[in-house]
């Protein structure tokens, strides 16, 4: 086992990364090894997808399968060995199908089929034991003793960034949005990573390519969400329980939320969003469901307590899931799509009857708690509509600064930095937030500036796209470079989606971003210095010191 993809990975003077019997996330060594093997198989599929495409052979099933299966290897997504094995076997079948199509097309056109790299030739074991015996070939740091540590760090930056992009591709696909050019570029990069490079410049340029690719994917996902559910609008949301039977929907998949709402209508069940599903409450399509009563709980890391106290059924539509046995609710939590936990019921298809039955058999909430409201829904359209008013307030001096404070949440005590930063931001500043990092301060009262709320919740982590559109619009209005705006980005990171959002921002030329609370363990000190020199990327320090720098206070 070697896994170093998330913030909570082991860090010691002897080296970084989880490499023992179990990772800090709870992932067992065998699961980690199987995931690495799955990635290796998927890279082999992409090798053939690239070669087949060169001859005009495109398999759209492969184009959707590879990102989806890759998504299952993100932090806190799938801990079920049998599901990972099934993905690996399916990958082997797709690779063989593409291989046959490629070779047949070569023969028909009189071309000689190319010799493929080892990553496209592995004969997958037939049993779990055989697959685990093959794991060393796919270990991410297998050649660490023969390469510079910066090379390994760059490879991992690319791999983890592409994982995040794959997740957003799958989110878009669920909403019916795919793109053949995006798929082609994804396969090309996936295949490149399958043949470990030692070219630092090529790896760095690939990281920027991944950022650019993800920008296109986020635009695709934005279109999918707004076409399906309308444009989010400022919405007041209750964050306290309401009397009645209950279902909690977590993750990012709003299509699943829609299905659950349709199937629970008239059944006396209240539906709540959780974590990254909170922004769904701002979409017009969901406002026709009176039994979508609000948001329950906070970010992913608190779920073992919050789900244990939730008297109903819980559905995990995507990341993040952690051990449900701790809070003894494994019998009433359900997984969907790429999510998996051993022993937890996995819902396939679009029938949520088993979830509904579980909700009805539980007590539900016995009384209404006193409401606590927050306001959400300041995504792209709402921000653009408010832009003229914002510009006027900037010009008259009422608004002097903007902060984007968001990203992933986590349980490290150092993350109080983000709460303190939001609370310490000057009263003449606007705070934009997104992702589950918002839960560090989204229930606090920040007031307004001439009717403009000082806290603007943009949405899910992928809604960084909305923030980028606002920044571009403001830079055009003020006729300045995006980096000359009175705007500072402070991003909390935990896993691979945050990595690819960061790569997206860097690839667009956004500079002087702060990330925290700790830098990715796979980035060497030298790589961190290069990123600082090139982009002004730096780690958070203290709120007082960072604010002085961001506000240019002497």
UniProtKB/Swiss-Prot annotation:
One of its GO terms (biological process) is response to hydrogen peroxide. Its cofactor is [2Fe-2S] cluster; hybrid [4Fe-2O-2S] cluster. The modification Cysteine persulfide is found at residue 408. Binds 1 [2Fe-2S] cluster. Coiled coil: none annotated. Transmembrane segments: none annotated. Hybrid [4Fe-2O-2S] cluster binds at residues 252, 276, 320, 408, 436, 461, 495, 497. It is found in: Cytoplasm. It catalyses: A + NH4(+) + H2O = hydroxylamine + AH2 + H(+). One of its GO terms (molecular function) is hydroxylamine reductase activity. Its EC number is 1.7.99.1. One of its GO terms (cellular component) is cytoplasm. [2Fe-2S] cluster binds at residues 3, 6, 18, 25. Catalyzes the reduction of hydroxylamine to form NH(3) and H(2)O. NCBIfam families: hybrid_clust, PRK05290.1. This is Hydroxylamine reductase.
């Amino acid at each position: 086992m070697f896994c170093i993809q998330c913030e909570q990975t082991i860090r010691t003077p002897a080296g970084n990364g989880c490499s023992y019997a179990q990772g800090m996330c709870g992932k067992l060594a065998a699961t980690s090894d199987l995931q690495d093997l799955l990635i290796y198989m998927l890279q082999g599929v992409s090798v053939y997808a690239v070669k087949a495409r060169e001859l005009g052979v495109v398999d759209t099933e492969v184009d959707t399968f590879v990102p989806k299966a890759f998504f299952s290897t993100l932090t806190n997504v799938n801990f079920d060995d049998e599901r990972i094995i099934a993905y690996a076997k399916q990958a082997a079948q797709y690779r063989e199908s593409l291989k046959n199509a490629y070779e047949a097309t070569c023969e028909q056109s009189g071309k000689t089929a190319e010799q493929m790299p080892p990553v496209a030739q592995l004969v997958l074991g037939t049993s779990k034991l055989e697959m685990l015996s093959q794991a060393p070939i796919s270990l991410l740091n297998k050649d660490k003793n023969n390469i510079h540590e910066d090379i390994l760090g760059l490879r991992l930056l690319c791999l983890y960034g592409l994982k995040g992009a794959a997740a957003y591709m799958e989110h878009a696909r669920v909403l019916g949005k795919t793109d053949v050019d995006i798929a082609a570029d994804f396969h090309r990069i996936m295949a490149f990573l399958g043949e470990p490079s030692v070219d630092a410049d090529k790896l760095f340029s690939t990281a920027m390519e991944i950022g650019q690719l993800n920008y296109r994917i986020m635009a695709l996902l934005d279109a999918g969400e707004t076409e399906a559910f309308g444009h989010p609008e400022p919405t007041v949301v209750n964050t306290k329980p309401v009397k009645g039977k209950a279902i909690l929907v977590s993750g990012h998949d709003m299509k699943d939320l829609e299905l659950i709402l349709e199937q629970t209508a008239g059944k006396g069940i209240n539906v709540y969003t959780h974590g990254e599903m909170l922004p769904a409450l701002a979409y017009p399509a969901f406002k026709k469901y009176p039994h979508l009563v609000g948001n329950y709980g906070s970010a992913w890391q608190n779920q073992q307590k919050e789900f244990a106290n939730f008297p109903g059924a819980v559905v995990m539509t995507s990341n993040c899931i952690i051990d449900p046995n701790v809070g003894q609710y494994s019998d009433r939590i359900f997984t969907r799509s790429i999510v998996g936990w051993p022993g937890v019921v996995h819902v396939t298809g679009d029938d949520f009857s088993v979830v509904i039955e579980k909700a009805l058999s539980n007590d539900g909430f016995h009384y209404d708690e006193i409401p606590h409201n927050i306001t959400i829904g300041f995504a792209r359209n709402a921000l653009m509509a408010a832009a003229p008013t914002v510009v006027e307030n900037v010009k008259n001096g009422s608004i002097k600064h903007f902060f984007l404070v968001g990203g992933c949440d986590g349980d490290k005590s150092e993350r109080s930095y983000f709460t303190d930063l939001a609370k310490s931001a000057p009263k003449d500043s606007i705070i934009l937030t997104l992702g589950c990092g918002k839960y560090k301060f989204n229930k606090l009262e920040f007031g307004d500036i001439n009717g403009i709320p000082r806290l603007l919740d943009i949405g899910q982590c992928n809604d960084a796209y909305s923030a980028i559109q606002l920044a571009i619009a403001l830079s055009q209005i003020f006729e300045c470079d995006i980096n000359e705006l009175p705007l500072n980005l402070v991003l909390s990171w935990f896993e691979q989606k945050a990595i690819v959002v960061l790569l997206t921002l860097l690839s667009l030329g956004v500079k002087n971003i702060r990330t925290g609370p700790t830098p990715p363990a796979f980035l060497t000190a030298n790589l961190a210095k290069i990123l600082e020199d090139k982009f002004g990327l730096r780690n958070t320090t203290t709120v007082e010191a960072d604010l002085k720098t961001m506000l240019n206070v002497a």
